[in-house]
C-alpha cells in the first residue's frame, strides 16, 4: 500500500471514529429536550470517542447543572459541549510570552514536535504569520530532514508569510541544522526562531534520542532554550495524546 493510501485510510479511520460517536449524540436531538437519560447517553458517547472517563464525567456533570428550557436544538447542545470543554481547558492554558530584547541570547526558540501528519509544519507557518503580524522578526528552520517535501512545504509557508526559512539537504543531521539556524537567526537579529522537526512516535527510542540531541545542541548555544516546546496533536487521537505528551516531556 502506498504512503498516500495509508494516510487516507488512517484519516478515514479517525474520522469514522469521531463521526460514529457524535452520531450517537446527534440522535438525541430528535427528543427536543435534555433529561437524565439523554445526558447519560451523551456521556457514554464521549467515552466511546476516547475522550476519557474523567473528562466525559465532568462534562456530563456540567450538563446536568444547566437549566435546560424549551426545545434543545443540535446547535444549542453543541455550544453547551464546547463551553464545557473550554471550561476544562482554560485553567491549563499557557500563553506564549516573550522577553524584552536585552542581548543576543534573547532569541526565543520554539521547538515543534509530534507524530507524523499531526500538522507541525502547518502550525509553524501559522505561528510565523501570527508573530509577523505582531511586528516580530521570525525565522523558521526545516529540521524535518526525513519526510519527502518537508523542506518544500515549510519553504512554501515561508513565502506566504515572508519569513526566512533555513534548511539543509534531505537526510542531513537535524541537530546540526538547528545549530546553524540559531547562528543565522542571531545574525539576522531575529526575535523568534521556529524549529520544525520530523514526526516521531513516542515509543521509538532512537527517534526520541535524536530529539534529545536537538535539544542538547540548542541549549549549548542558548541555555534557556527552547523556551517553548510545543507538541502538535491530532484532535481525534483520544487518550493516545496523553502517552505522546508524557513521553516527549521527559526528553
Residue ranges with predicted function:
Residues 250-251:
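Conserved small/polar residues in nucleotide/adenosyl-binding loops
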Residues 150-153, 177-178, 203-208, 240-245:
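Short, well-ordered secondary-structure micro-motifs
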Residues 6, 153-157, 210-213, 244-247:
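Alpha-helical scaffold elements adjacent to nucleotide-binding pockets in ATP/GTP-utilizing enzyme cores
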Residues 1-10:
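Compositionally biased, charge-rich terminal segments
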Residues 173-223:
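Phosphate-binding/switch loop-helix module in NTP-utilizing enzymes
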Residues 147, 199-200, 237:
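Short, glycine/acidic-enriched loop or turn micro-motifs at the edges of active sites
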Residues 163, 209-235, 247:
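Inter-motif core of Ras-like GTPase G domains
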Residues 13, 17-143, 149-171, 175-195:
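Primarily NTPase-proximal linker/entry elements flanking Walker-type ATP/GTP-binding cores
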